Amino acid sequence: MMKLSKLICPECQAENERNADACRECGHSLGFVNVNLLSDPYFQEGLEERYHAAIANLPGTEVQRFAEIIDREGQAVINMSFEVLRLLVNENEDYLSYQRGVEQGKIVKRTFQHDRFQCIVESAFYGFDGRNLVYAALSLDDNGVSAYGDVSVVLRKKNIEKRTTFFERDTFLLFDDLTEKGWKLKDIIPAGHCGTWRERTKIAAIKHGDQVKAGHQTADFAAMILKNGDERTDDEFIELHIFNKVGPTNFERITFQKKLTTPFERQQFKILKSKLSSLQVGVIEA
């Protein structure tokens, strides 16, 4: 059975398990578990191998230009409802992962079927700490996955890049893909499908390199990397996993994808806009 390498404490040099968050000897913080896991040579080498195989016969100049645009303009975007945004900003609440939200009584537990599947998938990829991850999508035009709400929130890169990992697609769909190909839950997930913030351009190139054409502009790439389908299972995007939580201080700008029509919504929008302005969060109206 494949085993990950040990994590060395930078303070006392003690060996720790790769999924440790604090040194077992001196208690020194070891960083973010999701990033530490995907920084292991097993994942790094597997991603590198798949990346080189994917781009071997592709036009290098065009793929490089695509990667540069992803690196420069790619954003982490979370879509949510107007009501959720209003709660986060007005009450200074945090946007939590599903499992942590349920634990704290802030998110209603889903049906047993959906609740069970989410917990299985998150633990299959990350173990215990799967419960600590907030999901976002990689975007080039500030638009996210509309199925989750009509408000798109762009996060500040400097607040999340050190605690974010990337998967080539929705992890629930990827889970199904891998199990259909024979992956067993007792095994570590196959390498080559995920990485850290540093590898985001390689993941994008693996997934979309063969679609890149000469003359493609940023808008073309934006439509390529994030597609909203008629059903959630039809959505296609590169998924970001942000460790812990995010809140209004992590927001960079917000786009309202539809007009607010009721007097109550318009009044609440004015209040929100004022509070967001005080946090230096940009607001784009539909």
Show where each model-derived region lies.
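Residues immediately within or flanking Cys/His clusters that coordinate Zn2+
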Residues: 6, 20
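Hydrophobic packing positions in secondary structure, especially the a/d seam
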Residues: 86-88
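Extended catalytic/binding region for NAD+/ADP-ribose chemistry, centered on the ART fold
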Residues: 124-147
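Cys/His-rich metal-chelating microdomains
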Residues: 15, 19, 29
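Active-site-proximal loop/hinge segments that shape catalytic or ion-binding/gating pockets
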Residues: 5, 38-60, 64-69, 73-84, ...
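Short Cys/His-rich micro-motifs in 6-15 aa windows
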Residues: 27-35
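Short, intrinsically disordered linker segments that flank or connect zinc-binding domains
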Residues: 1-2
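Short cysteine-rich clusters marking metal-coordination/redox-active sites
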Residues: 9-12, 23-26
